[in-house]
Amino acid sequence: MASLIYRQLLTNSYTVELSDEIKTIGSEKSQNVTINPGPFAQTTYAPVTWRHGEVNDSTTVEPVLDGPYQPTSFKPPNDYWILLNPINKGVVFKGTNRTDVWVAILLIEQRVPSQDRQYTLFGEVKQITVENSSDKWKFFEMFRNNANIDFQLQRPLTSDTKLAGFLTHGGRVWTFNGETPHATTDYSTTSNLPDVEVVIHTEFYIIPRSQESKCNEYINTGLPPMQNTRNVVPVALSSRSITYQRAQVNEDIIISKTSLWKEMQYNRDITIRFKFGNSIVKLGGLGYKWSEVSFKAANYQYNYLRDGEQVTAHTTCSVNGVNNFSYNGGSLPTDFSVSRYELIKENSYVYIDYWDDSQAFKNMVYVRSLAANLNSVKCSGGNYNFKIPVGAWPVMSGGAVSLHFAGVTLSTQFTNFVSLNSLRFRFSLTVEEPSFSILRTRVSGLYGLPAANPNNGNEYYEIAGRFSLILLVPSNDDYQTPIMNSVTVRQDLERQLGDLREEFNSLSQEIAMTQLIDLALLPLDMFSMFSGIKSTIDVAKSMATNVMKKFKKSGLATSISELTGSLPSAASSVSRSSSIRSNISSISVWTDVSEQIADASNSVRSISTQTSAISKRLRLREITTQTEGMNFDDISAAVLKTPLDKSTHISPDTLPDIITESSEKFIPKRAYRVLKNDEVMEADVDGKFFAYRVDTFEEVPFDVDKFVNLATASPVISAIIDFKTLKNLNDNYGITRSQALDLIRSDPRVLRDFINQNNPIIKNRIEQLILQCRL
């Protein structure tokens, strides 16, 4: 039977070339190592004496916390928070545009009973009633929108950090209110924002609005420890306008030189453009189910001007630490569901590998010092329509994150033609508004960026910044140091697999049913599976080895290992013998599972839940107790074989992933049955269950305990023709008891006879199974 291919893979009995094993170990070590990026990134040293170098700061990157500044009066820039850090009580801030905004912030000490105090506000002496019953400091925001009315207490802020904030943005003036550590922002509207001027009576800081989350953090939890020492001296605000000697956009500085080598410092302003890649996979069936919505690495090539020079750059964007979610609208075939959709949020990272054609990247092999500064960028998600056949389409929309520079190290990008020594910039994430939701479902109000439409129609996102590094390079500028081997998050294998998946799914729809049955009956092994693939005769053994090594990490192989882990003799026979059937019968690997399910049934009373849990294990039980009938894995292997023979994208690198993926994703909607005399018990992975008689197809009560006992002691059969199809066939055409038994046992000869007779019910069932064989 064709499923022999999967059983052979599960034996893990294969030979390996020593050179292949060494290559694999080296690759796995590179891929699994955790890089802690710091101010230095080093590779192999070269024969020179290293000397110190300088790293020029860049004016293209705004500091998060700028200050402290001395008390002053000025016209505040839009989109910048003014963080007030008063020491003494009294008036700490005044601001007005002389038309519709007059705002003053007063600081009241702790434990003050209600009393009247005099304050001078905008040249007027005002008597204001204040009180503070708290052990924290209290800011009174006094506001009026007309020069002829009195000030009113608008938004008090009770604070143990003694920090307040003020911002002009979007036709509004913003302040903080509430009580720390849960203070929030609020605003007053103005029609004349550009004319707002402020008088500040205390030390203050300036924070860009793009870092509002940091400002919120300072207000609620206090300034960083370094800002609370007496070594930090406030300076005049005019110091912001001092003209600095700005470093050049491109700088090549010789630090030292010998006869053959020289140390070079390269300083570069860079523009990084990147985009997210994604993969949306739809399950087979009626068109209401999606398998995954996931992030994929994406590369982007572009040109930009840098100091009058045309630069060609290449970036690769990948993500790490994704969060997996799922949505299931119900168990019916017409209920919308997404088995897995990915989301990036605060615990995730984004990696961007950057390369350009400048001299800095020509000899990036021996690197001593590496530093960088980059601005932040906000990435907002767009809409994605799940196009179901009938009814209003569910729409995944919204979601946003901001990327903040968190480190830089060395990497290598693999393009279609060449490997590029690159810089990898790591970004931490903060979630932003809006939240995302799936319209017409109960999913709403979640934060993060989903993989459905992460680019939101934009060709790319853009970040400006600067890097500086010191390299050891040949004294002869025309010589290029050979590139050293390296492994990155993104490899071209993903692109090849994407092309292969599309081709595979297209070819699988062209399979003739009689061809499928014939292939399903063949005893396909490793080498007959590869026989139709061109140019693989010389590498058949290596390819088989690669497939087996990949397959042993698959979900199916892991499940078998878990079942046999506590049974040494059974595990030994599974991993070493040529056939999984041998010696399994003496110690049933199903025993532990049935006991676990029996225990679960005591706490979970839903028969549907129990049968669903049992059915997901029945595939493993079927593998260990083969029958003469055709099973789902026979169909999977047959569908796998046909497109492989016709594929133009198959290669030794992609084949292991395709075979492993097929074992996990093909025919997700499976049903299994056990047969006892004239009674059949059948259950599927969605929790549907039937018990019926062979002669009449009359349903009888379903007993879970009996089903478990039968599945433990009797062979498990794939319900290729499930109960509903059998009943439909009997009601419309009438079938004999012998035919019914053959179909229940999934006899391939009887299936072929019905297909040759063009029986529409049987053909439709087989077509639905083929449609579920998608990557």
Curated annotation (Swiss-Prot):
Region (Spike head): 65-223
UniProt superkingdom: Viruses
Ranges in a coiled coil: 483-515
Signal sequence residues: none
Cystines in this chain: C317-C379
Further information: This strain probably does not use sialic acid to attach to the host cell.
Protein name: Outer capsid protein VP4
Organism: Rotavirus A (strain RVA/Pig/United States/Gottfried/1983/G4P2B[6]) (RV-A)
